[in-house]
């Protein structure tokens, strides 16, 4: 659903965030709009793969910094691995990402960074990002980093190694899309 088409009816603006990142909707509104557009509401999909056994955490854990900045704007995103919690925390320009309702840091078990072709399409800097063709990726789990490829399968971006899907660690996954993997710099972490 395109927020430009449905702004004010399907989407509403909240005052606790700055535009344009303050547009929200609900399941009921999306369902209503999908019915109006004649979209299928049910579809068979294969489940994502998840690890079923306890994977061993790395002896040395790795953190990653992703530079989304431009020559005029700084935007550094960092993920730091916490060995005790077995999860990553995220910060943006030094500010820890927290859950708006609980105030607690958002903790993720998988960080997936994918390289996808970006093309600027207008003078405002909007981008057309190729999420169909696949490419190279980096998958962070248990403090480890795995060089992967990625594929788009039925609208989902999945990690692939040697032609096979790689399983995610059960929990939360954060996918970062960058024009070049050089935007990601990996460092050995202390592991809290």
Model feature map: region roles:
Residues 1-192:
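A surface/extracellular/periplasmic glyco- and lipid-processing/surface-interacting theme
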